[in-house]
Design a protein with these regions (language model features):
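Amphipathic alpha-helical interaction modules
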Residues: 16-69
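Short terminal alpha-helical segments
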Residues: 1-34, 91-103
Length: 104
């Protein structure tokens, strides 16, 4: 359940391992909640992107905390969209895509 995954992520230290775990948990949850699979996928990809960007590098506490705050905001928006009409879910998916995957 997304609220559990988000709460666990929030309670962890803001290091890259927390992002890796969050991503894996979201990807795993896709199978258990197919009606919301796209939300879990985008959250997982977003967390994985942070992990991939900083894996093997020193990360300042400020950068890690900023990333964690952004991830929590997106996860909470996705939580709010669960059980809502498809248009609400699509809005959250678009928000995640625009904030995290824009190029150029």
């Amino acid at each position: 359940m997304l609220s559990d995954i988000t709460s666990e992520f929030e309670s962890r230290k803001p290091g890259i391992a927390s992002f890796e775990t969050f991503a894996a948990e979201c990807m795993s949850e896709m199978n258990g909640d197919p009606a919301n699979a796209s939300l879990y996928l985008m959250l997982g990809l977003t967390a994985r992107q942070f992990y991939d960007q900083f894996n093997g590098q020193p990360v300042t506490v400020a950068v890690a905390e900023e990333g964690k705050d952004r991830m929590l905001a997106v996860a909470r928006a996705a939580e709010a969209a669960l059980g809502e009409p498809a248009d609400d879910k699509l809005s959250v998916l678009n928000e995640i895509a625009l904030k995290n995957f824009q190029t150029g």
